[in-house]
Amino acid sequence: MIFSTLEHILIHISFSVVSIVITIYFLTLLVDEIVGLYDSSDKGMIVTFFCITGLLAARWIYSGHFPLSNLYESLIFLSWSFSIIHMVCYFNKKHKNNLNAITGPSAILTQGFATSGLLNKMSQSVILVPALQSQWLMMHVSMMVLGYAALLCGSLLSVALLVITFRKVIRIFGKSNNFLNESFSFGKIQYMNERSNILLNTSFLSSRNYYRYQLIQQLDHWSYRIISLGFIFLTIGILSGAVWANEAWGSYWNWDPKETWAFITWTIFAIYLHIRTNINLGGINSAIVASMGFLIIWICYFGVNLLGIGLHSYGSFTLT
């Protein structure tokens, strides 16, 4: 009873803190001068991490098994994974940490859905079904969820890269059309005025374009690093799941919906890594593949559970 109460307290604290973190972070986007706000948002994510860690530990103690037996517990663990990814990047002092825009909303959305009325039955701790009573539960599911979290963060960074890049292309294309449609009937005086304005604005435009270029490079860099980490976790999760499946069902691979979509997810991000490491194909092409992977992950992690079929149906739920 004590641990159950502690779990409810911690989940509400973590949800409240991460909500404040998101608000603070978006305020820093509007007011860059307030450095203290930015630092407090990072500290808020650290508080969130420890709250969710305590929540998972409390649930582990009173349930008697690692809290990854259903969708509710995996969503809480996914939220914890988002916070730990943020902390790893936060303690890397070489680069300014801009991941709050990704990890903060991701954590609050996963926690919000986990604590919604849809998963009330799953929030109650129950005895594990025989298929889950194995030491492989912690290894397989934790690696898969950590992989999902890292791949989701990296994919969202790629989406941001595409938005910034294509916004720039559209703006340039629009300016080019306006330039072609301009009339030159105003003569030499207008030409000299335009030339003067261009010279005055050159330094401003150059600095703005340089900042955009730096931002795109950072997004590509962090997306590649985080997706690479997530790909490793996903690979370990799939391999450990195959070993567990052989022990439980007598076969390493059965092509049920969850396994099939896990393989599709792995293939998509293998293609991403191949394109990203190819000098002639990297950049926009790899970001497009990663953006596709974002949708594939949610189908694999969440969408397949709606079917309620296959060997992984014990983790499913219905929307009725």
Swiss-Prot record:
InterPro entries: Cyt_c_assembly (IPR002541), Cyt_c_biogenesis_CcsA (IPR017562), Cyt_c_biogenesis_CcsA/CcmC (IPR045062). The chain crosses the membrane at residues 9-29, 44-64, 71-91, 99-119, 144-164, 226-246, 261-281, 287-307. Signal peptide: none annotated. GO terms for biological process: cytochrome complex assembly. One of its GO terms (cellular component) is chloroplast thylakoid membrane. It comes from the Eukaryota. May interact with Ccs1. Belongs to the CcmF/CycK/Ccl1/NrfE/CcsA family. NCBIfam families: cytochr_II_ccsB (TIGR03144). Required during biogenesis of c-type cytochromes (cytochrome c6 and cytochrome f) at the step of heme attachment. This is Cytochrome c biogenesis protein CcsA. The gene is ccsA.
